[in-house]
């Protein structure tokens, strides 16, 4: 297993240089990338490296030293890769429409082949109330993805995280806090479990095995779920376990065309509605 580490050097006059190094199992430095507080290029190059070198026999990790950073361009995730944010605070500073992290989109990906075995953990992703109306994290056609111990903050007229036609995705011990939106013009689920039709997804199942566990949803318009449906096409095996929903403007859980649902151990505090269910569009 190879590990990609990020370290920072702080100079007395306030200028910061971040070094992103590629290190093998023997702790030999293979590659080094440098940046200031704008970590976009360094992270992008690290992800390019994992894209070209990670595989099921060689799982790689990108580790960022603790700090506050800006991302000014969408970073595309790679398979067989973990990103350890290491308690860092990363802000969306995109001047145009764009996410902080997104699954690959450089070609057509049938089934669940866009992204597999990917982990993001241990840090904060701040939407920064960026007016580009983009999700902080967007995953499509992805499989075996885990988001753990990540705080999502301050989304503007979109979702903190959006899943579109994914399988085996888990959010564990995450926080979703802060949102500006308008339910008259935007659906506003903090975690949207969306759906793609056959044109996008070649007729394959929309969702399977999505787990939201030990998470906190606070000061958002809607918590988790979807508002879209296609007749006779279900999202299956959805689990929402031991979560806390607090100060929810509308609905904490929106389950439209969900099948084989497990919802238990959740707390609802100051929510307009705890849960909404609609089967097959009815």
Give the location of each predicted region.
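Short glycine/acidic-rich loop motifs that flank beta-strands on beta-rich extracellular proteins
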Residues: 70-74, 92-98, 128-135, 156-163, ...
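Right-handed parallel beta-helix
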Residues: 82-89, 113-127, 143-154, 167-180, ...
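Acidic Gly/Asp/Thr-rich repetitive segments characteristic of extracellular carbohydrate-active
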Residues: 25-63
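N-terminal extracellular ligand-recognition/capping segment immediately after the signal peptide
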Residues: 34, 56-97, 125, 129, ...
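Boundary at the C-terminal end of the N-terminal hydrophobic targeting segment
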Residues: 12-18
């Amino acid at each position: 297993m190879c590990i990609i580490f990020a370290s920072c050097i702080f100079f007395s006059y306030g200028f910061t240089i971040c070094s992103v190094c590629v290190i093998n199992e023997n702790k030999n430095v293979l590659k080094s990338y440098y940046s200031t507080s704008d970590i976009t290029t360094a992270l992008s190059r690290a992800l390019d490296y994992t894209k070209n070198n990670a595989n099921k026999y060689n799982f790689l990790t990108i580790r960022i030293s603790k700090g506050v950073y800006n991302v000014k361009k969408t970073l595309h995730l790679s398979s067989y890769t973990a990103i350890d944010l290491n308690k860092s605070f990363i802000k969306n500073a995109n001047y145009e429409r764009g996410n902080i992290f997104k699954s690959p989109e450089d070609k057509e990906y049938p089934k669940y082949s866009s992204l597999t075995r990917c982990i993001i953990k241990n840090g904060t992703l701040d939407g920064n109330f960026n007016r580009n109306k983009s999700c902080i994290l967007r995953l499509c056609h992805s499989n075996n993805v885990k988001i753990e111990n990540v705080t999502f903050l301050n989304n503007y007229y979109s979702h903190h995280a959006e899943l579109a036609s994914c399988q085996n995705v888990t959010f564990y011990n995450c926080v979703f806090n802060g949102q500006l939106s308008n339910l008259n013009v935007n659906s506003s689920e903090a975690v949207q479990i969306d759906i793609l039709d056959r044109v996008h997804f070649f007729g394959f199942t929309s969702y399977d095995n999505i787990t939201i566990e030990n998470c906190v949803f606070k000061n958002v318009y809607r918590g988790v779920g979807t508002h879209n449906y296609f007749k006779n096409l279900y999202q299956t095996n959805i689990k929402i376990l031991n979560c806390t929903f607090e100060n929810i403007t509308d609905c904490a859980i929106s389950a439209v065309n969900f099948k084989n649902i497990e919802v238990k151990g959740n707390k609802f505090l100051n929510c307009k509605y705890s849960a909404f269910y609609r089967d097959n569009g009815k």
